[in-house]
């Protein structure tokens, strides 16, 4: 216990504790900022010296006294038997490995939207496809669902919800544009 992939889901379990967030993109920065409101201390660990998240989020992270950034670093080991007690972090530039005592690890890596399919069709917003809650894009008949869509929260439950909304919206679109009357009623 102590390893999580969702700061908003599990952050409350670490109230007033020390945690690490692994990653350097927007999700990692958002997680670190969220956890800084709950936890005593947050380590943000990234394999590069520069973060990849938006400049606005980077500024907020660096201004937050509860967040310590460890760049050019990789987590080599999560310590503890049944509960996380710390991590071993290797700093690439100095070639040193140190142990940090902490209570939880939040993994926020590899969360870039797979939106290349949409690039020729529309302008993306930071790599995400702009769409409202009904999952409709600005192009008639083109819908998007899941974490590739612009939205506030990216979790499995919201991706599944997007799928249901998209199906309902697509059905409505198809039946509205069904000139021959072959389709049934919309949702």
Residues covered by each model-derived region:
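Generic hydrophobic/aromatic pocket-lining and core-packing "Φ" positions
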Residues: 32-33
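Glycine-rich Rossmann-fold phosphate-binding loop(s) that bind the pyrophosphate
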Residues: 23-25
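FAD-site-proximal beta/loop scaffold in flavoenzymes
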Residues: 1-13, 107-158, 162-165, 169-172
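Residues that mark the start of a beta-strand
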Residues: 17-18
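A Rossmann-like FAD-binding core segment of flavoenzymes
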Residues: 36-133, 172-187
């Amino acid at each position: 216990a102590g390893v999580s992939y969702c700061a908003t889901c599990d952050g409350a379990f670490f109230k007033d504790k020390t945690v690490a967030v692994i990653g350097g993109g927007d999700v990692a920065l958002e997680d670190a900022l969220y956890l800084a409101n709950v936890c005593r201390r947050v380590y943000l660990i990234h394999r590069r010296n520069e973060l990849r998240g938006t400049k606005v989020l980077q500024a907020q992270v660096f201004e937050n006294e509860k967040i310590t950034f460890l760049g050019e670093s990789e987590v080599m080991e999560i310590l503890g038997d049944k509960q996380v007690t710390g991590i071993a972090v290797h700093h690439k530039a100095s070639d040193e490995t140190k142990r940090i005592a902490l209570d939880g690890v939040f993994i926020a890596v590899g969360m870039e939207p797979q939106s290349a399919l949409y690039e020729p069709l529309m302008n993306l917003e930071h790599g995400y496809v702009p769409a409202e809650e009904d999952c409709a894009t600005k192009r008639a008949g083109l819908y998007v669902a899941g974490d590739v869509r612009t939205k506030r929260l990216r979790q499995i439950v919201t991706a599944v919800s997007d799928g249901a909304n998209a199906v309902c919206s697509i059905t409505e679109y198809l039946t509205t544009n069904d000139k021959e009357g072959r389709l049934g009623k919309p949702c």
